[in-house]
Amino acid sequence: LLSTVMRETLFRGQAACRPLIAKRGLSDSFVDPALRFLEGRGTDFSLNNRLRGLNIEDGRVVGLDFGDRPAALDDGDTVVLAVPPLAAAGLVPGLEVPGEFRAIVNGHFRLERKIEGFSFLGLSGGLGQWLFVRGGVASVTVSAADDLAEEDNASIAGRLWADVALALGLGDVPLPSHRIVKEKRATFAQTPEQEKRRPGARTGLKNLFLAGDWTTTGLPAT
């Protein structure tokens, strides 16, 4: 995985190493435009309905079980299953998926003033790893944070804010309004054993395909 990342970035020169930052968040940059694109082409959306099962006949998916709202499929329909790995394993018979995961912890802090001309910074020597500033909010990320995720939010906030204040040159500023977000299954554990468990996009069912960073993309999940 590391060699692929290096070939796609460092070995291709500075133009391939320039990070892109979403100005107003990932929803504004990716999700909302995608929804508008699909809506403009007559796509129907059904949100907040958990997929409970796949109806399978003769090696293909013929229906989707949403509980009280089943959906039958036509002969030419294709299903793209973009759900977390454990959910996919519960839906697709015989599907092997990564079963070990790593946590990510994020801290978001309200700044007293906007920091002009600053977007993001890699941190070294502290707890935080990446620092992003958008508007009046500073966000700091810690990956592979399994142990940290078990700590209480107050302790995490204090430690991360110390990194933020130092990196931004804020001095001895009291802990501001903040939010700590823990995602205990943020990525699968990218070990050799778990890498072997990543499935491809194609499945044993003719019209069912998988999507997700936990599939065999050739790249890390983060």
Features from the language model and the residues they span:
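A structural signal for the hydrophobic beta-strands that form the central parallel beta-sheet
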Residues: 45-47, 81, 210
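Short, intrinsically disordered, charge-balanced linker/junction segments flanking boundaries
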Residues: 42, 88-91, 219-222
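Conserved beta-strand segments of alpha/beta enzyme cores
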Residues: 44, 174-177, 207
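Mid-domain catalytic core of redox enzymes
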Residues: 49-181, 200-202
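Active-site/ligand-binding neighborhood in enzyme catalytic cores
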Residues: 1-57, 75
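FAD-binding beta-loop-beta segment adjacent to the flavin cofactor pocket
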Residues: 129-133, 183-210, 214-217
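Glycine-rich phosphate/pyrophosphate-binding beta-alpha loops
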Residues: 145-146, 214-222
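Short coil-to-beta-strand
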Residues: 2-7, 135-138, 203-209
